[in-house]
Amino acid sequence: HLTVFHRTANFSVPAQNEPLTEATLAHVKAHYAERRALGREAVTGVFLSANDKSALEVSDEDRLKEFEFRWRGAGGGFRMLRAFNDLLRNPIANQYAGDFVRGKIRATVKDPAKAEILCPKPDLPFGTKRLCVDTHYYETFNRDNVDLVDVKAHPITEITPTGLRTTQGHHELDVIVFATGFDAHQAERIEAFDARNLPQLGTHGIRQVGGQAGGHVGRHCAQ
């Protein structure tokens, strides 16, 4: 049995991970130069099939169709952020995206009370806090062996020898997993094969493609 003690809801979008077909691999490899060029011009630094239209210039039907395509058909993940060109610049466009995802949460989570706990509040604009990317995250809360506790409504008061107590009552637990996050920006001593560290490697300047990045986005850096 799993009990999730939930504080603040963030937006989560489906990863849509799937095996790459030979046709997909061939298409990507045939367009490496084009994808690199598009990535250099993208605000994210990577090619995410951006839509150049505003969310305000299309009909409600076309807007919903584009969001659905990003949610299920465009590879999922961060591609939701590129559904329209003004999601992170126009409050109304952003609200459309946020309302779409909240609608997906309410449609997926069968218990209305759980769904509302999992819905990000209106004071969190879509995409302004790093998106979570998941595989069946919201569906998990439909399982009989998964409970959800809102610790904003019922704060944790103490850890006991047998579990955890909130203002609502005591929860018997075998294991407590602390989801307190991690420090992604703390300096780390990274050495090259010849034992030189990063400051030494940058003595004569730094060369990169489009910018610098570290932490959890470091994998996107070009050498």
Spans of model-derived segments:
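N-terminal FAD-binding dinucleotide-binding subdomain shared by FAD-dependent oxidases/monooxygenases
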Residues: 3-223
